[in-house]
Amino acid sequence: MKKFLEKKLKKIAYERIDILMSLAEEEAKKGNWDRAKRYVYLARRIAMKMRIRFPKKWKRRICKKCGTFLLYGRNARVRIKSKRYPHVVITCLECGAIYRIPMIREKKEKRRKKLEERLKAKSNSQTS
């Protein structure tokens, strides 16, 4: 009974987090940055209280340093860099915090293609 109740509570918490974050997005688009920040704060508190992971789609839209909702193009700058390793750089224009998100999927695809090419070349040389 306890596990069932826990699952139900966590599901409700995820729903509330999603609602609060969508409200924060709407308020940020209107220009009410303080209200958006408050909604983000409440959503994070719910996640901490219920000890659940914050959804990834929303986690990247929050500045970890100042807690503002990041609207790309307005209060956040997004750049794609390929130095050292391919990654996306998100800069909060409120506090200047920088977040790097590696583009792992693209790197894995590149490795897979190279491996396939090597295998094809190897099989062609053996058949000749």
Curated annotation (Swiss-Prot):
Reactions catalysed: Endonucleolytic cleavage of RNA, removing 5'-extranucleotides from tRNA precursor
Subcellular localization(s) per the UniProt record: Cytoplasm
A Gene Ontology biological process term: tRNA 5'-leader removal
The protein, known as: Ribonuclease P protein component 4
Quaternary assembly: Consists of a catalytic RNA component and at least 4 protein subunits. Forms a subcomplex with Rnp1 which stimulates the catalytic RNA.
Gene Ontology molecular function terms on file: ribonuclease P activity; zinc ion binding
Keyword presence, rRNA processing: no
The family this protein is said to belong to: Belongs to the eukaryotic/archaeal RNase P protein component 4 family.
Gene: rnp4
Source species taxonomy: Archaea, Methanobacteriati, Methanobacteriota, Methanomada group, Methanococci
